[in-house]
Amino acid sequence: MKKSFQKSLIAASVGAVMFAAVGTASANSLLFPFFTTNSGAQSVLSLSNTGTAPATQALHYVYNYGAACTHFDANGSLTANDVLSHSIASPAAGGFGKVVGSDTSVPVYFPLPNQTGFLIVSSKTVASVDALRGSMAIVDPTTGLVVSYAGIDNAKATSGINGANGEGDYSAIVDLNFPLTVLPAGIVSTTFFAVVVGDMGAVIGAGADWKGAGTFSNNGNIWNNDEAPFSGTVIKPVVCQATLVPTDFATGAQAAAVGPNGGLVKTTFTPTSLAPNLPTGVIMTKIQTVLPAVGAPFAGKQFLHREQAGL
């Protein structure tokens, strides 16, 4: 990558995340449901500490990455009223490090390139439900993705030992039903990134991989883009996180009947509880890529948003 373009990429992602960080989600555990360390991409995390005592607050980063949702964690720190912005990827893995190199706060970088996953960052020093704020921006020139979003707030005081006092507890998320739509395949390619959540505290405390699991069902029907239903049941198992495509929710016959013009599927996720992995819901993210047939300047752009639950 040319240095000038790389600097522009970094500036764009940093500017987006620093702007978005002001007044965004606040809690002592923040969940960021999607990051990437793909070659040439930058995922940039921005955190701020609104606590005033003590001056330096311990942070616990828990990365969950790859098909196996592998656990990687370490401790960082954040001084009072500071803004810490840094690349998710370590400099050795293609990241640029801290936005301000002289910042005395200590981030935890992810050491591997070409990975995707989700991240939980928790405050460990101050027993407060609003000391930690944060957001993430992602710029990926290969896929065309440019997005900034706030971390998801669990509103629990998470001080103390790792995994205790509500750290990683997202059992309040009980989203199970999602009406998923797909635009015509000739103009947009659609994928979904599902993250299974629940109370992850015990798993975090043990330093183990989160194995929250369950199955998606299409509830026996899918619809084409003109409301015609086609029956057939598909069950899709998911453990921790998964990238899903529209055909994961359809039989071969249903997919052929719906055709290339897009459609609707009303999915339901059924959690499977096996202690200490106790899932309660799903965070579903939709990723749409505009295809070359659309033409410039839109072709090659990628859009990401969190899907709203409810049927």
Ranges and model annotations:
Residues 1-7:
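Positively charged n-region of N-terminal signal peptides that target proteins for export
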Residues 4, 14, 23-311:
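Gly/Pro-rich, tryptophan- and cysteine-flecked surface segments typical
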Residues 10-18:
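Hydrophobic helical h-region of N-terminal Sec-dependent signal peptides
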